[in-house]
Amino acid sequence: MEKLLIVNADDFGLCKGQNYGIIDAFRNGVVSSTTAMMNSVDINHATELSAQYPALPVGMHFVLTFGRPLTAMPSLTDANGELGKWLWQRAGAGTLDLNEIAQELECQFERFSAVFGRPPTHIDSHHHVHMLPQIYPLVAAFAREKSLPLRIDRHEVQQHGLTLDNPRSSEWFNAGFYGENLSEPSFLQLLEHADQQGVNSLEIMCHPAFIDQTLMTSGYCYPRLTELAILTSPTLKPAIAQRGYRLGSFLDC
C-alpha cells in the first residue's frame, strides 16, 4: 500500500526570502504543503505567490510567539506590543489568558480566509505552541469546529499527557529535518523511522528559504538554505517514491 508523505514548509509569509524558497521547493522539489503566518509583514507577498501557484496547498501557521498579534493581547505582549518566547514562562506559571488566545486564533483564521479567499487546508503553529497542554484543547476544538486537520506531535502528546479526540491528522509527525547537520540521507532516515512505527501517513516539517535581510536576523538562518538545496535535489523525489511514499497534503487526510 502506498504511504502518504506531507512535506510541509512552515513560515510562509515570514519574509520574501522564505516565500520564494517555499515556492521553489514546491515547484522544483518535494515540498507538498505550506502553512502561512497571518501576522507577518510579508503575508501579502505570500498570497500573491499562492495565487500564481494555486496547486500548493496552504494551511495556517498559528502564531503566538512572533511579531504583533492581530488582536489586543496584553497578557502575551511586551511594552512594544510584540509577542515572544516568554509564552512558555507564562504557561509554566499558569497565567495564560485563554480567552485572548481564542480570540487571536479566530482572528488569524478569519484573516486567512479573507486574504487567501478560502479556508486553510489545516492548522499547525509557530514553535509548536498549540501542543502546550493549556492551549491544545482550545486549538483542537477550533479545528474540529471548522472541520480542519491539525498537526499532532505524538512526542508532545506523550510528554504532556494530552488526550486526543480522534483529530484529523497524519499518523506521524517528525520535526527532525531541522538544525545544522542536514542531508538527503538524514531526510530519508525520517521515512525509515516512520516505517518502524508502522504508520501509513507522515508529515515532515521544513523551512526552505533564500536568505534575505530578515532571515539574517533569525537564529535559524543558513540551514534554511541548506534545506532548500536538499529538498530540490533531483535524487530525493525518486528516493521517496522508491520507499513507497507519495507526496500529498492534509487534503489527503
Swiss-Prot record:
CDD domains hit by this protein: YdjC_EF3048_like
Annotated Mg(2+) binding sites: H61, H126
One GO BP annotation of this record: diacetylchitobiose catabolic process
EC number in record: 3.5.1.105
Metabolic or biological pathway: Glycan degradation; chitin degradation
Top enzyme category: hydrolase
SUPFAM superfamilies with a match to the protein in the record: Glycoside hydrolase/deacetylase (SSF88713)
Pfam families (UniProt xref): YdjC
Keyword set, alphabetical order: Carbohydrate metabolism, Chitin degradation, Cytoplasm, Hydrolase, Magnesium, Metal-binding, Polysaccharide degradation
A single MF term (Gene Ontology): metal ion binding
Cofactor(s) recorded in Swiss-Prot or TrEMBL: Mg(2+)
Reaction(s) catalysed by this chain's protein: N,N'-diacetylchitobiose + H2O = N-acetyl-beta-D-glucosaminyl-(1->4)-D-glucosamine + acetate; diacetylchitobiose-6'-phosphate + H2O = N'-monoacetylchitobiose-6'-phosphate + acetate
Location(s) in or outside the cell: Cytoplasm
GO cellular component, one term: cytoplasm
Similarity-based family: Belongs to the YdjC deacetylase family. ChbG subfamily.
Function, in words: Involved in the degradation of chitin. ChbG is essential for growth on the acetylated chitooligosaccharides chitobiose and chitotriose but is dispensable for growth on cellobiose and chitosan dimer, the deacetylated form of chitobiose. Deacetylation of chitobiose-6-P and chitotriose-6-P is necessary for both the activation of the chb promoter by the regulatory protein ChbR and the hydrolysis of phosphorylated beta-glucosides by the phospho-beta-glucosidase ChbF.
Subunit architecture: Homodimer.
Protein name: Chitooligosaccharide deacetylase
Organism of origin: Yersinia pestis bv. Antiqua (strain Angola)
